[in-house]
Structures are given as structure tokens and as C-alpha cells.
Amino acid sequence: MTAGAAAEPATAPSHMTRVSAWPGRIVGLDLARAAAIIGMLAAHVGDSGLRGDDAAGWGWLWVADGRPSAVFAVLAGTTISIMSASDRVGSGHTAVRVATRAVILVAVGLVLNALGTPVAVILGNLGVMFLLVIPAIRWTPRALAVAGSGVLVGGAVAFRFVEGAWDGIPVAEAVTHYYYPAMAWTGYVLVGMAVGKLRLREPAVASALVWTGALGTAVTYGVAILVGAAAPWQTATGPWWASLTAHSTSPFEMVGNTFVALLVIGVCLWIARPTPVFLPALAFGSMSLSVYSAQIVVIAIAGDQIVWHPSNVAFAVLTLALMAAATVWRVFLGAGPLERALTLASTKAADAVAAPRGSGSGPRP
């Protein structure tokens, strides 16, 4: 699994150079994962003119502030539902797999945080969110959507009063930490789980996600601006609860980000095809956990200045280099290194704990 990878063969088939061979994968989700990772790269090292000495960056890069990580979290939830649907052993087996992945995500997050980069690493927080949603694995799409909406709004309001309460407490601080507070961000994962239970291969579902996302984003942003909030690309003003500023964790920001995620996923489901044209992006998205981790390592090696004094040249070079590496890896080796490790570890743990005696594990996402 990347934070959200679907079914993955253990090794690359000999004909992997034909991009039509993406067995078991919903390529639109891989494209959406690629979009989320590129967005986070832009947020970390891209120049929007709002950070560093250069005020002449690409102003439109404001779209990469906060939203890509929300898309990433929604896609993670989508993967959980796809895992559950493909698990022939049962929900208990899926729960152990999700819990194992959660522990590994927390561990990888701690390692990446230890590198001391200025980047707020999402993986540890995402691991905590995985643990929190385990009881919801068998819920219906409607129940997941309602619960997700409640957590997004209710968690955002509650966060206002407990922000940073557990800072300094390893792992637990993920619940109330500023950038990705699990008490609110778990709503993204729940909504993603609802999406993952839909028939994502059907064009009508992609269309519904596009229209829901587009209209929802327009209404949410429009209402927030009408009640006095600044537009997302402007300096923050207005009431806190209507703020559209990235990582403000206001109810409007959380809901708006959710609709943006639905729009991105819907568009990617619409346009993605398993053809050579899409190979680099699909390879990039299919190993998003490995790519995300690699960019943190690169930033650690390059030094903090690559973040505090961003350059769109650095953004473009880093993105293209990682995409090229992912493409070569995918063609010759198949699943990404961290994705493969995550799949093997979670499957073995689940088979040992929850599989009926004598049952075969079969392929796992």
C-alpha cells in the first residue's frame, strides 16, 4: 500500500513494459495518488511567491497548500475499503492487516521525522487514523459518509479548543497536532472509505464524483467568502470557523478539501487509461508511499534551504527525477519497495492472527 495502493502482484510480470498490464488496479486511483504526491512536492519545495525571498513565484501554486495531503488521506481510506472487499478471509483479517499497516506507517513517519526536515510528515498521523477507523470497516457507504462528515466538522470545532494538547507525547500527539490532527482528519479517511465501496470502474460513478466535488467546492468556498473569509489565495481574514486557509482546520476548510478530493478522484477516474502515455504518472502513483518517503530523504540531504527558499526549478527536477525512477522501478520490479514490504508484513500478520486454520491467504492489496 502506498497510503492508498490497491491490489498489487508480488512481482512484475514479464510483459510489464506493456502498460496495459495493470492487473487488479484501478488506474484512476493511481493517477489521483500521483496528483496528490505532485501537489505535496509543490507545497514542500515549489515557489508560490509566499515563502522565501522570491515574491515572483507561480501564484497558482496556492492550490498545493493543504489540499494534496487531504486528497492523500481520502485515497488512503479508499484503499482500506478496496482491501476489505478483496479480502476473502473476513473483516477480522482485514482489521489486522489495517492495524499492521498503521503501525508500519507510524514507524516510517517517526523515522522520517527524525531526519529533521522542515516538512510536516503526514505518515505517522495517517497511521493513527488507520487505527481509529478499524471499527468502521464493515459500515455502509452512507454510514461512512455521514460519520466522515460529522468527524470533519465536529473534529474541526473541537480542535479549536484542544489544539496541541498532546504535543510532545509520541504517537498520541497525532490526535491534536496542528498540521494533520487525527481528531478531524480521520473524517477524510472515513469519506475515502465510503468512496472505496462504490463501483469505481463505472463511468457514472466517476461523473457523480466530479459533479459532487465541483459543486460542493464552489458552494463551500462561495459561502465562506460571503461570510467574510478570505479566498484561499489571499491573506487570512474573517471568522476562524469559515477560514479557507491551508491547515487552518476550520469546518469550511475541511469540508472544502473533501469536495476537492472527490473532484480530483472523479476526474482521474474519468481520464486515466492503462496506456503508455499514462505510464510515468501511474507508476508514480502506484508507489506513492515510497515516493513520498524518498522526497523527504532528498530534502534532508539537500538541506532546509530547499524548503525555506523554494524554487520551481527544484520542484520540477525533483518531480521528474522521482517519476522517472518510479517508472523504471515499476517496469522492471513491479510494486514499490515500501509498498511490497507493507503488503507482505500486513498479510503475514493477518494470516498468523486472524486467518482460519488451513486457509490460503491469496493475493492481497
Language-model region placement:
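Alpha-helical transmembrane segments and their immediate juxtamembrane cytosolic regions
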Residues: T2-P365
